């Protein structure tokens, strides 16, 4: 059979015609679908703007809080429970509803914005065990200003929630994370130290903060180290907390006895510490003692973690040490510290925070019992120092708590302080 006759036979065959038509329709639909996909990709690439924020970014928590204010019509929600402490000391529970993982739409500044919250169950945070998350914002147009506005609004909202409070950070892995909820700022005058001590430290640290150019012009590293030493319970940590509130700084708590802390991790943590923060190394004597003592008894005075003594020294004042940093160290036993750790450059100001003086006792009495005659405070201080020459502010405060509304009882029962 000639080929032309074969083609005519197929053409006249109704089954073949129907099959060919189906193939043609299927091909056309497949091409249309592919074209629509390519068109959608091109449209999203050239006419839409996308912002992805991973969970480890600091703005992630800000944006989730911001979404609770702008997604009131969302029906699929997750809950975050927090505890709020009032000025009176009463604690109440607060529930915040945030969009659950999935797609949501919000109306913002005259345009619809698609919010996609993703949760990857295959990846978890090794420190907390929570799944890895990210949130993606998508909007029509190519103007990034809408995302800048969202981030600025979220940041302002977060700062508003932290206004008048001190934020605590703790080291988790290779980053700093907020520790608990922001605390009310403690007034600086609520911590009564020896006369003039608080003023000296505040004056020194304010001069440092206000004069970065002075350090730069003279080629001096722009960092400052402080050491507060003295008996326990005398107000070293309390003063640093109050000082952070006075300066409107946060506090970064770093434990040198952490078994996972290494030289590299310490260097990294100091280099990425949040802006406007005080890095606090408490009880440094517990981590590293004098090298002379270590030679005498290497097992007893061996460092608890992987952090080496030379690594700590280099992190505080080495080639790789960071600038624009304020470090506070505290210890109960300064004689146990290696001289290399507290030399100038690593520790610029050392202050002894000791037992209560006569002036401190009168000031504490007047603060706890305002309106009482100054002579009563003087009488209290004299009798306390006669009863004992070594008494810490923590002991005095605990004693005052027994006589909250009874100043005369506090004066007449001093013998119990012995």
UniProtKB/Swiss-Prot annotation:
Q: Does the keyword Phosphoprotein apply?
A: yes
Its chief place of residence is: mitochondrion
Stretches assigned to the Mitochondrial matrix side = 33-418
Report the residues modified as Phosphotyrosine.
181
Transmembrane regions: 16-32
Reported consequences of knocking out the gene: Mice show phenotypes similar to the human GRACILE syndrome caused by defects in respiratory in mitochondrial respiratory chain complex III assembly. After three weeks of age, mice develop growth failure, hepatic glycogen depletion, steatosis, fibrosis, and cirrhosis, as well as tubulopathy, lactacidosis and short lifespan.
Query: For side Mitochondrial intermembrane, which residue ranges?
Result: 2-15
Tell me the membrane topology, using the record's own terms.
Single-pass membrane protein
Keywords in alphabetical order: ATP-binding, Chaperone, Hydrolase, Membrane, Mitochondrion, Mitochondrion inner membrane, Nucleotide-binding, Phosphoprotein, Transmembrane, Transmembrane helix
One cellular component term (GO) for this entry is: mitochondrial inner membrane
What reaction(s) does this enzyme catalyze?
Answer: ATP + H2O = ADP + phosphate + H(+)
Q: GO biological process annotations for this chain's record?
A: mitochondrial cytochrome c oxidase assembly; mitochondrial respiratory chain complex I assembly; mitochondrial respiratory chain complex III assembly
Give the residues the record marks as binding ATP: 230-237
User: What function does this protein fulfil?
Assistant: Chaperone necessary for the incorporation of Rieske iron-sulfur protein UQCRFS1 into the mitochondrial respiratory chain complex III. Plays an important role in the maintenance of mitochondrial tubular networks, respiratory chain assembly and formation of the LETM1 complex.
Q: What is this protein called?
A: Mitochondrial chaperone BCS1
